[in-house]
Amino acid sequence: MNIFAEIWSRVLRLFDRQEMDKTAQSRSRRHKEEYEQTERINFTAIFAEYLANRTISDSTMSVKDGSGNDSRRSIWIADGLKKIWIRNKTTVSQALGIGGKVLVPYVQDGRPYVDIIDQSRMVITAMRGDEITGATLMADMGSKDGKVYYRFADYRLEGNVHTIRNRATTDNGGEIELGILPEWENIPPEIVINGPEHILFGYLKCPKDSREDKQIMGVPITFGADDVIRDLHTCLADIRREFSLKKSFVGADDRLFDKNERLPEGGLFKRFRTTGLKGGDFWEVFDPAIRESSYLARFQQLCALLESTVGVSPGILTEPRTASATATEIKSANAATFSMVDSIRENIETAFNQTAYALDVLAEVYGATPAGAMGDWQIVWDWDTSMMESSTETFNQFSELESRGLILPERLVAWATGMSLQEAKEEVAAAKALQPSTVDVLLTEE
């Protein structure tokens, strides 16, 4: 969906706001359009999906209170975050493809929810250092009687006072009553919350460097690789053309055709006393060699260059360099990709912490859980490290530490089984209860 710059200008005037980066909105829309095109091979989508899979697969997220246990507040926050975690692979892939996604929490009927919108629907209006303190979001859209309406939400943090203002507009940016659509009737035009230290939404940003001093908006994972991608598409077109032009065909003497310019249908032909044209054969086969090796070498070279430009190790578009490699060599070969994955995970943690903070504030404001539990939560991450670590090696390390009494047995069980620490503790206790005591063993032996 595109919203033209002049419409955004009217909306910002409606809220008395100014865009910090005058070109960020148009760039974000262009990146979104490029990412969504499906008519030809989309290299940005390939990298985004690959890295999202590497980042999320076999990883878990949970929310606990400050003591590592479940509380009503932590369970409520987890309910909101898990709604977005279950589709996090898609969310991360799109964030890498277009530059970022905005996680907007809200409360409905006492339950937590989080809307996920593209950064192309956000205009940043104020910042404090690297932290967003003001933004206008195109939060929703709907239609009635064939007309399209938009709902914009303006977030502003000034000191410790957080204001959220909602306005509805027509498709040209003109203001209209907020209750124009039934689903918007109960949305308050303005909400003022005292006490928040951060803006009440999360921003999942692609870690790719935008090469600007003040990196306000995220950029796609393939940012800066336009020339390489253009050359790759040209090379693919050349390869298709090469195969098309080099198709084999058979030329036949004109005396083999009948009066309707057709060859005989059967496999038997009338013999001629004379040979073909200028003493040649009646049949001439055109079957030139295809220069696929040269074209494919060029294609592989461009693929390797694109991987380097993105900042990942070989193995996404090119062959991985892990054949007959040792574990140490495999780690070294994947170092760049793992570094990128690590940066993506850091940004995911930041976005989820921002969203959890917003849910925590909203729970207090709307009384969704008992008051007084503000800040008593923590997100527990268990990221998969198999790309860089050997599971056997890690198990041996945990076992050695446990046998020396340096870690609790439940730590080892939790790692090996994927249980929570509390579940592992109960499992260890149950297992020990089934083991005979030393006295029982001695009596049995006697």
Features from the language model and the residues they span:
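Extended, helix-rich architectural segments
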Residues: M1-M122, M127, I132, P320, ...
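Charged, low-complexity, helix/coiled-coil-prone segments
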Residues: D16-T23, R29-T38, T170-G174, T234-A252, ...
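Ser/Thr- (and often Asn-) enriched beta-sheet segments in non-cytosolic proteins
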Residues: S62, T163, E177, F249-V250, ...
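Short amphipathic alpha-helical segments
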Residues: R73, G80, I84-N88, A95, ...
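Short coil/turn segments at secondary-structure boundaries
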Residues: T91, F243-G251, I316-R321, E410-T417, ...
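Extended, regular secondary-structure scaffolds
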Residues: V102-I216
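Extended, charged amphipathic alpha-helical segments
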Residues: P182-S332, A336, A368-G375
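C-terminal anchoring/interaction modules
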Residues: L263, L268-L277, W283-P288, Y295-V310, ...
